[in-house]
Amino acid sequence: MNESFDKDFSNHTPMMQQYLKLKAQHPEILLFYRMGDFYELFYDDAKRASQLLDISLTKRGASAGEPIPMAGIPHHAVENYLAKLVNQGESVAICEQIGDPATSKGPVERKVVRIVTPGTISDEALLQERQDNLLAAIWQDGKGYGYATLDISSGRFRLSEPADRETMAAELQRTNPAELLYAEDFAEMALIEGRRGLRRRPLWEFEIDTARQQLNLQFGTRDLVGFGVENASRGLCAAGCLLQYVKDTQRTSLPHIRSITMERQQDSIIMDAATRRNLEITQNLAGGVENTLAAVLDCTVTPMGSRMLKRWLHMPVRNTDILRERQQTIGALQDTVSELQPVLRQVGDLERILARLALRTARPRDLARMRHAFQQLPELHAQLETVDSAPVQALRKKMGDFAELRDLLERAIIDAPPVLVRDGGVIAPGYHEELDEWRALADGATDYLDRLEIRERERTGLDTLKVGYNAVHGYYIQISRGQSHLAPINYVRRQTLKNAERYIIPELKEYEDKVLTSKGKALALEKQLYDELFDLLLPHLADLQQSANALAELDVLVNLSERAWTLNYTCPTFTDKPGIRITEGRHPVVEQVLNEPFIANPLNLSPQRRMLIITGPNMGGKSTYMRQTALIALLAYIGSYVPAQNVEIGPIDRIFTRVGAADDLASGRSTFMVEMTETANILHNATENSLVLMDEIGRGTSTYDGLSLAWACAENLANKIKALTLFATHYFELTQLPEKMEGVANVHLDALEHGDTIAFMHSVQDGAASKSYGLAVAALAGVPKEVIKRARQKLRELESISPNAAATQVDGTQMSLLAAPEETSPAVEALENLDPDSLTPRQALEWIYRLKSLV
């Protein structure tokens, strides 16, 4: 049966009618329908869940004359199954029994109590600890895009207005949302196709007036002027849809979402999707996290610190006041790193605990962890108090103290609480007098049963008599089969066993009712007290969120201080003058994976030297040199120290990389097409303050086409755009550019060749490379010797055809070694076809006149 069923459910059983009505409200997502100790799925949901979760697909009787496909999961294991579904981009509606089976006529009342979606999860078990989990919404009109993101586990709400497709693609790459909402008429489907968690939403959810109303209602404001987003209509359309979706799925208030922030292009260094991918900031080219910049830099001790560091890496800021403040803090903290990190480690993930508190889904152990975080604050204050740094003291102030809340949680929650409130035993003894009384009654059962057993043995004289309890039959008096005929007349048989009989007496039954009542009352009161704790904590939510943010920032800065000391990084200097000057720069990732010392190299880019033409052998280190420059700039612009002896860096607005390429088969684009698309983006958007890395432009086409394109691109970047450019190439013709235009210089990475072996020096020198060592590299790669030998022969042939291959031509180009030979003269061609032995003297004379006319 398909879920697009007829709304007339009268042919079905009452229970299936209830299920189908609930399912009709959530047709697009899986419905977990609670039945006793299981969540059941029916019809198409069951078939889908069976495939996604690898669980058995069975059948449950029949309804409306058809067998019902069914699959189920145990309620106690639901979080594990939800995690699997969320990771596959699925959403699930959780339907619970809210009625009492004992008093219900017909099916027990059920209700969808929450909807779990990839972008709105807050449960600890479902989240990646050290990664942001974002819900996003995208909107498009004739002027550009609107984009909003929300991290429900922190309340961080952002919007932006990307002007064009490339910028929008870069934002999607940077934020990598777990779930993306888009309008039903969204035109640029190619931009989002293939992304996980796509959700098509009706147009009215993006309506601007509705969005303003929703946002003002959420923030308790009359307008959005105070947030600086009043005129960001496209961004607000996306934000309104996003907020509506969160309210629909969470079905509770969202007090931790207290503001919205506009992200503006001019505030940060812009990196397109290709640049983020090529620089391997948080993900390597294979999709993993090994050997990335984050893998080297992230030794934070809290999950919230790790997430903040990754946000910094993907959004380097251009405000040098902020950057200098971070640098100062990193320097000031160096003497206290070893004392601070063990204490910070104990703080844990306070940010996400607060989100669960706001959503009222925090579990007892969340409150215990919050208490433990509060207990670290006095020690952190004591250590930071001695640090002579204004930014550090500002952070310390934001951390707060929360002594009253710490005291409350120490009094209210036991040291090691159970997982769930319904398990009981969460509220500490002494916190509430009535609860202690009910517990004493329940806990006193053991003493009472011991006294009853002794009394009844003495009264009856039966030495096999025991008093016990089990969950099915409650309290009982047990007598062995051999003595059961001696049981007193007031003993009422309750259960017969193989070797014993079990009885009940009125006194024991009365006590059982009293104990069970006390346990139920204790649990109900405990749940009430637990809910009251939320009411006592939530008024402090804004201050608590500020504290969590300050603690995360402290963790990041302490981590950067430790990394600077451990990895021998230096503090870069910011200048208003354009350019980058690096002394003994190193690649932060490569130097960590090498088994040999890394060769540090200098770099000098300035208004007088804006472009470096980089030549040298394959594997010589050109790409490493280029990438390390971009990574050093990136680290400088998050406020970090950098891997170099000395760095002076001017304003940078964008970083572009055109490094390597692969076929984009899904979009039907060849390697060369991908390369040219990325190149076009650079030429259209780079400015004189952009850092541009161009590696091997023009490889995917013919020699002359490739050389022409590379020449023209270099010329455009150097003469027109005047960007800070590193231009690596194997076209030696380009080494003539410095002679033809200002601001261009040659550098090369050298190698030494000895016989069939080659040694790469990895050292950057001024001037052009003398040769490319292509055959030596091929031999090193294991190309068969006979192929290398034949290649050398062919190379000699080509060089003999064009002996002046390295000479500069008048038109500014240079003959490639593989270029076609010069066009043969008609006289030479005639002589080649001539057989002198067959000529008569008269014919020979005629040939002389003919050749004369051809010259």
Swiss-Prot record:
<dbReference type="InterPro" id="IPR017261">
    <property type="entry name" value="DNA_mismatch_repair_MutS/MSH"/>
</dbReference>
<dbReference type="InterPro" id="IPR036187">
    <property type="entry name" value="DNA_mismatch_repair_MutS_sf"/>
</dbReference>
<dbReference type="InterPro" id="IPR005748">
    <property type="entry name" value="DNA_mismatch_repair_MutS"/>
</dbReference>
<dbReference type="InterPro" id="IPR007860">
    <property type="entry name" value="DNA_mmatch_repair_MutS_con_dom"/>
</dbReference>
<feature type="binding site">
    <location>
        <begin position="616"/>
        <end position="623"/>
    </location>
    <ligand>
        <name>ATP</name>
    </ligand>
</feature>
<dbReference type="InterPro" id="IPR000432">
    <property type="entry name" value="DNA_mismatch_repair_MutS_C"/>
</dbReference>
<dbReference type="GO" id="GO:0006298">
    <property type="term" value="P:mismatch repair"/>
</dbReference>
<keyword id="KW-0227">DNA damage</keyword>
<dbReference type="InterPro" id="IPR007696">
    <property type="entry name" value="DNA_mismatch_repair_MutS_core"/>
</dbReference>
<dbReference type="GO" id="GO:0003684">
    <property type="term" value="F:damaged DNA binding"/>
</dbReference>
<dbReference type="GO" id="GO:0005524">
    <property type="term" value="F:ATP binding"/>
</dbReference>
<dbReference type="Pfam" id="PF00488">
    <property type="entry name" value="MutS_V"/>
</dbReference>
<dbReference type="Pfam" id="PF05190">
    <property type="entry name" value="MutS_IV"/>
</dbReference>
<protein>
    <recommendedName>
        <fullName>DNA mismatch repair protein MutS</fullName>
    </recommendedName>
</protein>
<dbReference type="GO" id="GO:0005829">
    <property type="term" value="C:cytosol"/>
</dbReference>
<keyword id="KW-0238">DNA-binding</keyword>
<keyword id="KW-0547">Nucleotide-binding</keyword>
<dbReference type="Pfam" id="PF05188">
    <property type="entry name" value="MutS_II"/>
</dbReference>
<dbReference type="InterPro" id="IPR045076">
    <property type="entry name" value="MutS"/>
</dbReference>
<dbReference type="GO" id="GO:0140664">
    <property type="term" value="F:ATP-dependent DNA damage sensor activity"/>
</dbReference>
<comment type="similarity">
    <text>Belongs to the DNA mismatch repair MutS family.</text>
</comment>
<dbReference type="InterPro" id="IPR027417">
    <property type="entry name" value="P-loop_NTPase"/>
</dbReference>
<comment type="function">
    <text>This protein is involved in the repair of mismatches in DNA. It is possible that it carries out the mismatch recognition step. This protein has a weak ATPase activity.</text>
</comment>
<dbReference type="InterPro" id="IPR016151">
    <property type="entry name" value="DNA_mismatch_repair_MutS_N"/>
</dbReference>
<dbReference type="Pfam" id="PF01624">
    <property type="entry name" value="MutS_I"/>
</dbReference>
<dbReference type="Pfam" id="PF05192">
    <property type="entry name" value="MutS_III"/>
</dbReference>
<dbReference type="InterPro" id="IPR036678">
    <property type="entry name" value="MutS_con_dom_sf"/>
</dbReference>
<dbReference type="InterPro" id="IPR007861">
    <property type="entry name" value="DNA_mismatch_repair_MutS_clamp"/>
</dbReference>
<dbReference type="InterPro" id="IPR007695">
    <property type="entry name" value="DNA_mismatch_repair_MutS-lik_N"/>
</dbReference>
<keyword id="KW-0234">DNA repair</keyword>
<keyword id="KW-0067">ATP-binding</keyword>
<dbReference type="GO" id="GO:0030983">
    <property type="term" value="F:mismatched DNA binding"/>
</dbReference>
